[in-house]
């Protein structure tokens, strides 16, 4: 078993480039040997390298730290991915006074008390990832309280701020980092921007830019698309001459494009003006020119209102004419009634026997009076028609753009016509009353006639009955 560890150590040193001429400072044995019994190799194999500062034995299945080698200069120890559950006091017994960084992640440490031996070491960083102890309540505060020198637990400080990378390189506290930082400095020196060397055959300028010259291929100039806008800008408004003889102007492409658009617009306007002149010339040749003017909406509304008023007046005139036509049948009806009365009287005379001529003459006078009354009524109707015609003429004469005066004028004329009709009706009633008063005179004349002629008493009685029959009919 020890032989396997010796071969693994020699292979690791050769891979790291460590020779016998210079002492080894770092040794990595991760997974090199599988410990069947969970024990470390013999202490003598590793104690040969007292100059070791970094030792890593991870993933080999170590379960016990008994017999750990004494390495006075060891500052970083990695024992992750093993089966360590306790026995950390063996590290203290090994006299690791320089140890600052201990990695025990992914092991089987379950109790915070198992970490108590580490308080005797001056640890600065302790890693316990994936260990069951990390699930204990207030695990971090307890560990920091136990190990006073500890600054970082699981790569975070007490305030849970991550550990800077510079502290990882300077674990021994002497202020000097490892060789990796020195190698980084060498790489930075190799990439000095002031060397003046530029890839792809470009030429560096003092202002830090790189000017790539255009390449002519088959008469076509190919300019790199990666040219920056800063390279195209010419300082102090001057012109830049390239090596191939081309000159770069300070005017941008956008200004030229805008000027071209302005020229095109001016040409379009000139063409439109020419077309307008041609249209004007053609228009002069035509005799009939139609001009369309926009009429305000208010005037249209007024005209519509006047037309509506005219229509209303026409309707009123038609109604007045209809009233005149209806008045004429009334007059004819009265004449018919008068004629009917006369007819009844005639029938009465026909039925009578032996009436005298004087009696017939009196009845004829009554008929003439009735006919005169009818003529007066007809003349009144004629006057009504003339008034209606005058009203029609007045309405036609009073047509004006204003609606209210016309309506008032028409209304007043109709009121006057109605008043005239009422007066004429009163005159007719008076005439009827006069006709009724004349009837007794005829009856008295008839009585005198009967007194003079006693032989015709029977006929006179019949005549009196006919006259009495006429009275109620007339008054009705």
Curated annotation (Swiss-Prot):
GO cellular component term of the entry, any: nucleus
Pfam families per the UniProt record, alphabetical: LRR_9 (PF14580)
Domain of life: Eukaryota
Compositionally biased tracts (Acidic residues): 165-194, 222-232, 252-289, 299-329, 353-371, 379-396, 415-436, 458-467
InterPro entries: AN32, Leu-rich_rpt, LRR_dom_sf
Chain residue ranges for the region called Disordered: 157-476
Database matches in Gene3D superfamilies: Ribonuclease Inhibitor
Keyword annotations: Leucine-rich repeat, Repeat
LRR repeats: from-to residues: 51-72, 73-92, 98-119
Domain LRRCT: 131-169
Molecular-function GO terms, alphabetical: histone binding
Family affiliation: Belongs to the ANP32 family.
Name recorded for this polypeptide: Acidic leucine-rich nuclear phosphoprotein 32-related protein 1
Provenance organism: Oryza sativa subsp. japonica
């Amino acid at each position: 078993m020890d032989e396997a560890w010796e071969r693994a150590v020699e292979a690791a040193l050769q891979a790291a480039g460590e020779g016998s001429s210079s002492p080894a400072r770092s040794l990595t044995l991760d997974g090199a040997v599988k410990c069947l019994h969970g024990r470390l190799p013999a202490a003598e194999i590793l104690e040969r390298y007292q100059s070791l500062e970094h030792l890593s034995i991870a993933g080999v299945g170590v379960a016990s730290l008994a017999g750990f080698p004494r390495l006075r200069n060891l500052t970083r120890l990695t024992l992750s991915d093993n089966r360590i559950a306790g026995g950390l006091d063996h590290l203290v017994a090994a006299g690791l006074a320089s140890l600052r960084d201990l990695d025990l992640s992914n092991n089987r440490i379950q109790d915070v008390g198992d970490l108590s031996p580490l308080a005797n070491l001056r640890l600065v960083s302790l890693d316990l990832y994936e260990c069951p102890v990390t699930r204990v309540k207030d695990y971090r505060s307890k560990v920091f309280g136990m190990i006073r020198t500890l600054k970082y637990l699981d790569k975070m400080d007490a305030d849970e701020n991550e550990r800077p990378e510079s502290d990882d390189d300077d674990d021994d506290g002497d202020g000097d980092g490892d060789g990796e930082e020195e190698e980084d400095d060498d790489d930075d020196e190799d990439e000095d921007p002031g060397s003046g060397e530029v890839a792809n055959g470009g030429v560096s300028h003092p202002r830090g830019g790189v000017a790539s010259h255009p390449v002519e291929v088959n008469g076509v100039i190919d300019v790199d698309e990666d040219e920056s806008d800063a390279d195209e800008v010419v300082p102090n408004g001057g012109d830049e001459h390239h090596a191939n003889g081309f000159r770069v102007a300070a005017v941008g492409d956008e200004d030229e494009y805008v000027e071209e658009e302005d020229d095109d617009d001016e040409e379009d306007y000139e063409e439109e003006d020419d077309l307008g002149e041609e249209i004007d010339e053609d228009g002069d040749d035509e005799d009939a020119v139609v001009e369309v003017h926009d009429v305000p909406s208010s005037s249209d509304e007024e005209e519509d209102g006047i037309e509506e008023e005219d229509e209303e007046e026409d309707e009123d005139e038609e109604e007045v004419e209809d009233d005149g036509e209806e008045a004429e049948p009334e007059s004819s009806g009265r004449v018919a009634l008068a004629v009917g009365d006369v007819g009844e009287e005639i029938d009465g005379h026909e039925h009578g026997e032996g009436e005298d001529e004087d009696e017939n003459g009196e009845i004829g006078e009554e008929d003439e009076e009735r006919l005169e009354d009818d003529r007066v009524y007809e003349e009144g109707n004629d006057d009504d028609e003339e008034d209606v015609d005058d009203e029609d003429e007045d309405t036609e004469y009073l047509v004006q753009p204003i609606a209210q005066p016309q309506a008032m004028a028409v209304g007043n004329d109709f009121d006057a016509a109605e008043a005239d009709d009422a007066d004429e009706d009163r005159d007719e009633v008076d005439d009827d009353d006069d006709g009724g008063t004349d009837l007794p005179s005829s009856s008295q004349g008839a009585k005198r006639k009967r007194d003079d002629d006693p032989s015709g008493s029977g006929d006179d009685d019949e005549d009196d009955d006919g006259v009495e029959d006429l009275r109620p009919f007339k008054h009705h």
